[in-house]
Amino acid sequence: MKIKRILFFILLAAIVLTIPGPGELQLLAAKSKAPLTLVIDAGHGGADGGAEAADGTQEAELNLAIAKAIQSEGEKKGVKVIMTRETADGLYGEGNLEKHWRKLEDMKCRKEIIASSGADVAVTIHMNCFKTDGNVRGAQVFYPKTGNAEILSASESLAGSIQSALIKGLDDGSNRSQMGRGQIYLLENPTIPTVLVECGFLSNPEDLGRLKQEKWQQKIAECILEGILACIEI
C-alpha cells in the first residue's frame, strides 16, 4: 500500500511538471496549426529612412532586405509569411504631408496588419545606432512590457529563443541579451507574441560592413527563423 502511495505522488509530480506555464500557452497553441503563420515587419520605409550610417546607408533598406530573406527561408520551410511591406514605400497615404502624421499612420497600419493577420507571432526588423559610441555593436532582441500577461510571457520566451540563435549563429562575440522595452508602438499591448530585432549597429564600422553584405543578411534571417521555430517547436 505504501509503495502504491509513493508511485501515485511520483506520477502526480510528473504531471504537474509537464503542465505549461501561462506564458507558454500562446506558443504551444501555435504548434497545432499548419502552417505556422508569421508576420514580418520591415521597419521604416518611404520618407522615413530610419537610422542612417556615416556612409549614408539607410536602415529602411537593410530592414527590408533581411525581412525578405526571412520570408524566403520561411516559405521554404512551409511557414506562411505575411509582410507589412515588400517595397521601399512606407504605409501611409499620399495626402499626409506632415512627417508626424505620416509616421503615426504608418505605425497604425503596421499594427492593424498584425492584429488582423491571424498570425501566431510577429517580428519587426530594425537596425540600431549609437552615434556617441561607435564601439557598441551586436544584434539584440526586445520584447514588450505592457499588455496581456500570457502574450507578454510568450513574447519574452520568443525573444530569448531568437537571441540565443543569433548569438550562436552569428558568432561575432557581441553576446547581447534580450530585454523588455517600453514606449515602442508595435510592442505596446500586442495581440500576439511580438518581438523587435535590432540586427546590429549602423554606428559601428564592423557591424555596418557586415550588415551591407547579402551573406550576412541571409545569416541573420536564418538565425531569426531558427529562433522562432525552436521556440514554437515545429
Residue ranges of predicted features:
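Active-site-proximal helix/loop segments of hydrolytic enzymes
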Residues: 4-9, 17-33, 64-234
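Short glycine-rich His-centered loop
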Residues: 36-56
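Acidic active-site catalytic centers that drive phospho-/nucleotidyl reactions
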Residues: 41, 48, 59, 124-126, ...
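Periplasmic OmpA-like peptidoglycan-binding domain that tethers envelope proteins to the cell wall
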Residues: 53-61, 206-207
